[in-house]
From Swiss-Prot:
Domain of life: Archaea
Biological role: Seems to be required for maximal rate of protein biosynthesis. Enhances ribosome dissociation into subunits and stabilizes the binding of the initiator Met-tRNA(I) to 40 S ribosomal subunits.
Pfam families associated with the record: eIF-1a (PF01176)
Gene Ontology MF, one: RNA binding
Protein name per UniProt: Translation initiation factor 1A
Keyword Protein biosynthesis in annotation: yes
Organism expressing this protein natively: Archaeoglobus fulgidus (strain ATCC 49558 / DSM 4304 / JCM 9628 / NBRC 100126 / VC-16)
Stretches assigned to the S1-like domain: 8-82
């Protein structure tokens, strides 16, 4: 099987819930990171406790964020993509930033 025939399951942002793609730009420590979102806004994002020790996030990772409803320059991380998933998203045209 070629790499194009491989089946990859990829979670996409739920636009009804306000989820956006983002790229990690810097690590700030204490479970906080800077994320450049697909709408062009740089947000201070929080890594929730359920993800802290299970999923390690580094600079350059593609993530899904949910902006806070009362403070638009802040967000929560809900998902981190692996490298094969990012390649698939780029090939299919989902990542445009």
């Amino acid at each position: 099987m070629s790499s194009e025939d491989d089946v990859i399951r990829v979670r996409l942002p739920d636009r009804k819930k306000g989820e956006l793609f983002g790229v990690v730009t810097s690590m700030l420590g204490a479970g906080h990171i800077k994320v450049r979102c697909e709408d062009g806004v740089e947000r201070l994002a929080r890594i929730p406790g359920k993800m802290r020790k299970k999923i390690w996030i580094r600079e350059g990772d593609v993530v899904i964020v949910v902006p806070w409803s009362f403070q638009k320059d802040r967000a929560d991380i809900v998902w981190r993509y692996t490298n094969p998933q990012v390649e698939w998203l780029e090939r299919k045209g989902y990542l445009k930033f």
